[in-house]
Curated annotation (Swiss-Prot):
Entry's family note: Belongs to the vitamin-B12 independent methionine synthase family.
Pathway, per record: Amino-acid biosynthesis; L-methionine biosynthesis via de novo pathway; L-methionine from L-homocysteine (MetE route): step 1/1
SUPFAM superfamilies: UROD/MetE-like
CDD domains, per the entry: CIMS_C_terminal_like, CIMS_N_terminal_like
Residues binding L-homocysteine, per UniProt: 440-442, 493, 608
Gene3D superfamilies registered for this protein in UniProt: 3.20.20.210
Species annotation: Pseudomonas aeruginosa (strain UCBPP-PA14)
Role of this protein: Catalyzes the transfer of a methyl group from 5-methyltetrahydrofolate to homocysteine resulting in methionine formation.
Stated name of the protein: 5-methyltetrahydropteroyltriglutamate--homocysteine methyltransferase
Annotated residues for binding of Zn(2+): 650, 652, 674, 735
Keywords assigned by UniProt, alphabetized: Amino-acid biosynthesis, Metal-binding, Methionine biosynthesis, Methyltransferase, Repeat, Transferase, Zinc
Keyword Ion transport: no
Amino acid sequence: MALAHTLGFPRIGRDRELKKAQEAFWKGELDEAGLRAVGRQLRAAHWQVQKDAGIQLLPVGDFAWYDQVLTHSLTFGVIPERFRAHGEAGPTLHTLFGMARGVSDDSCCGGAHAQEMTKWFDTNYHYLVPEFSADQQFQLSWEQLFEEVDEARALGHQVKPVLIGPLTYLWLGKAKGAEFDRLDLLDRLLPLYGQILRRLAGQGVEWVQIDEPILVLDLPQAWKNAFERAYNLLQSEPLKKLVATYFGGLEDNLGLAANLPVDGLHIDLVRAPEQYPSILDRLPAYKVVSLGLVNGRNVWRCDLEKALEVVRHARERLGERLWVAPSCSLLHSPVDLEREDGLDAELKSWLAFAVQKCREVAVLARAATEPEAAEVLAALEESRAVQASRASSPRIHKPAVQARLAAIKASDAQRRSPFAERIARQRAGLDLPAFPTTTIGSFPQTSSIRLARQSFKQGKLSEAEYIEAMHSEIRHAVQIQEQLGLDVLVHGEAERNDMVEYFAEQLDGYVFTRFGWVQSYGSRCVKPAVIYGDLSRPRAMTVEWIRYAQSLTDKVMKGMLTGPVTMLMWSFPREDVSREVQARQLALAIRDEVVDLEAAGIRIVQIDEAAFREGLPLRRNAWPHYLEWATEAFRLCASGVRDETQIHTHMCYSEFNDVIESIAAMDADVITIETSRSDMELLEAFEQFDYPNEIGPGVYDIHSPRVPSREEIVALLRKAARRIPAERLWVNPDCGLKTRAWPETEAALVNMVAAARELRGDLARG
C-alpha cells in the first residue's frame, strides 16, 4: 500500500471553535487555560478524523494560534523589540497576539503597531511577515511544536512534524532598518533547524515535512545556491526529511529540488500535472515521492479514476517509495461537508471538504496495492457517477450562456470612442468642479443595518419592511453626503453583506454553503461562494437601490458593482472550465447590469477590481496570458455604454509598477487607488508610464479610526498634483468606509472636502 498523508489540516474547527475562543480570549471572557483547552480539543479531534479517514502519517505543527509563519517567528525568537516586555522570561500568547494585532498604548509594554500581513502566495490566506534586522539573532524561544508532538504521540498517533523551510521562511520576511540581504541570515538560522530536528528525533519522530513552496517561484541564482548549501548542512542532522512544494510546478527548479540531499519530495500535481514524468526521471532511486493528487484548495470531488492512472504508473516505478497526499495543506479547504444539511443533494454530491479529501487520499493510496478491495471499487464507482453527472448536468451547462460567449466580438470589449473623446463628453455632461470629491462606495455598516438584514433573512421582517429599512439608511447616507458637500454621491451599500456574496446570490451558477468556512487570517474566516455552472444574471441586481438613491438628489449618483476578476478570485471556481471562461461569463452578467444602470439614468458606474493584481500567476512567464484575459474581462463588462457614461474602477493594493500597462489597458475613465500609507509614492508608476486617464489617489487611510487633518490631505494632494495633471485628479479616501463609525467618517470627509476646495483655490489663482 502507498502511504497516505496530509500536509496540514484546517485549524478553525467544524464550527469555527478556534475563532470563538480567540475572540473570547481577546475580550477577557476566556482565560489562557480555557483557550489552550480549546486548542487541545481541536488538535485531538483533527488528528482523529484524519486517522479515521485512513491517513497514516498525521501532520503536527499545522495548528497555529493565529498563523503558522508567526508561530515560526516565535519559535526562532524573531520578535521585534517593540513586543518584548521587560522582565518576561520569554514570549507568551500575549506576545504572539500582540505581534498579530498590535498592542494598545495602555498595555504593559506601551503601544506597538502590528506586524505587516500579506497574502500567502496566490491563496486568500494571509500570513504575518517576519521582521529581520541586520544583526538578527535566532534562538529557540517557543515550545509549541514539541508540546504538540508529545500530545499526538500520547494519543497513539504516528506523526510527521511540519516546518516551514529555512529558505522559504527568510524569503517571506522583510529587512527592517538598514537594507541587507536576507540570505546573510541563513548561516545564523540553520543551527536552529539542527536543534529542532535533534529534539524531534529525541521525541521518537521518524519523518519531518519541510515546506519549501518558494521552489515553485522564479528564484534568483543566489537563492538556488543557498538551497544546496542549506540542505547539505542539514543532511547530517537526524530524521528523514520530506521537502514539500505546492501551488505550482518546479519548472527550472526541478533539478535543484530533485537533487537536494533529503529523503523525499512532495509535488503538486493538481496545479502542475505536467511535471510528473520529469520528476520520476530526475529523482534519485532512494527517494520517496509524494504525489499531490487531491486538490487541497478547492471544494470539488477528485476524479479518482483519472488520479488512479497516475498512482498505478507511479507504483510500478516507485514501489514502496510512493506516497499520496492532497496538493497542498487542507488549510485552504472548508472542514467537513457533512455539516452541510441544507445543500441541494445533487450539488452536495459533487463536493468534498477537508475530511472528504482525506478519504479520497486514503482510497488512492490503498488502490495502489489493493485495486480490487471493496472500499476502493465502491469509491471508484461513486466517483465515476459524480463525474458523469457533472459532465452532463443541465444545471452546469447552459446553451444560452455558451452561445453568448461564442458570439463575443473584439469590438464588444472596446468603448465606442477613445478616452480623449469620451472624457470631453463626460465633463460636459457631468459638470463637476476641479478635484471632484467622492467616496469609494460603502458607508458604515451599523448594528441596525446588520440587524435588519438578519431579521429579513430569518423571516422576522417582511420584504416591504426590509426595503423601507434600507431606504431609510440610503436617505441618511445621501443627506450626509449633501451636507458634507461631496460632488459625486454613493448610496452607501447598506443592503450588501459582502462585495462578492451580494452579487453571487443573485447570479445563476453560484451556490452557497452554510459551513464552508476557511481561515483568511487569525480569527477572520470567509465563506467563499462556489461557482458550479455557467454564470448568468436572471434580473437586475442593484438598479432599484441606485435609482431610489438618485431620486433623492440632483447630484450625480454613482452605481457600485464588483468586477469579474474579483468575483472569480474570491470564489471557489469551477475546475471543468478555465478561469478565463468563468471571468468572461461574469463579465457578460455585469455588463448587463452596467447597461441597465445607464438606462435608469445613472451616469457614473464604478466596477471594483480589488483582486486584479492578486490573480497574477506565481511565475512571470504566465503573467501575459492572465493580464490579457483579465483586462479583456473588465473591458467586456464596461463597454456596453455610451461615451457619456463614466466608468470608474477601484483597486486597493500597494504595487502598480509591474502591471501599470495592463491597468491602462482596462481603459477605465477613472481609477481610484490606495496611496495614503505610501505618502503618494505609488503615483510614481503612473507618472513614469504617463497613465492617460483620470486618477483618484486615496488621501486618507480608512483602516485606521484616526481622522486626518485638512492640512495633511492638502499636502498629499499637492504632492499628487506634482505627478498627475490637476485636471485629471479626483479626491477620495483609500477604500470603502464600511468598517468605520459615522463620527470619524464625517470628520474625515469634512476635512477631505475642505482640502479639495483649497486646491481649487490654488488652481484658480494659478
